[in-house]
């Protein structure tokens, strides 16, 4: 989340950790079920799915509540959210990464954000986010496909800009989504606020 006064990173570590446990345990139970020749879901598997549904609902509601509360407290009137059609259907990042990604209900998070924004009187805008992660926000690179890009990822989670600054890759993407929705005036490139985002773990602090 980036705005005129801060950059926030909402940690997904707890959700990813839960997904790892869920996938590993479910795989073990599936193997046992297959060996025993059982066709239907076992009671334990059904309980696991129910528990995961409650966990994800709780995580999405807490995250969306924290975001909207922040917007209200800082008098921010519009929330712009990046979105790609077929996000979970077409993504292919390898087996392990696919499991982590597709088990996070982003559509549910967007839905929670939308109705909480409406209740708070905040305008909610979704915009396609193509090329926002590749283009250099700090260098005001045009957000479109290029043969070569001004900036690049230098290591996991970090993006090196052509202006010589290194920022969090998610912050770079969020800035570009803001540019798509609000125009380049959204950016203040000489500010240091983007370089040290505040990290928030909602599931631990709520």
Regions found by a protein language model. Give the residues of each.
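Positively charged, helix-rich recognition surfaces that bind polyanionic ligands
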Residues: 1-206
């Amino acid at each position: 989340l980036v705005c005129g006064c801060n950059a926030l990173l909402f940690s997904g570590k707890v959700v990813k950790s839960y997904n790892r446990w869920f996938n590993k345990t479910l795989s073990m139970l599936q193997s046992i079920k297959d060996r025993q020749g059982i066709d239907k879901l076992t009671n334990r598997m059904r309980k696991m799915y129910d528990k995961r549904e409650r966990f994800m609902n709780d995580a999405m509601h807490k995250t969306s509540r924290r975001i909207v509360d922040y917007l209200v407290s800082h008098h921010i009137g519009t929330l712009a959210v990046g979105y790609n059609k077929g996000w979970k259907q077409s993504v292919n990042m390898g087996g392990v990464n696919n499991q982590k990604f597709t088990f996070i209900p982003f559509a549910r998070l967007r839905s929670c954000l939308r109705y909480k924004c409406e209740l708070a009187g905040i305008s909610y805008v979704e915009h396609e986010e193509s090329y926002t992660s590749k283009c250099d926000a700090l260098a005001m690179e045009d957000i479109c496909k290029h043969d070569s890009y001004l900036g690049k990822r230098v290591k996991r989670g970090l993006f090196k800009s052509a202006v010589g600054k290194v920022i969090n890759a998610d912050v770079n993407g969020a800035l570009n989504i803001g540019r798509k929705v609000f125009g380049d005036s959204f950016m203040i490139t000489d500010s240091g606020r983007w370089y040290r985002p505040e990290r928030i773990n909602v599931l631990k602090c709520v």
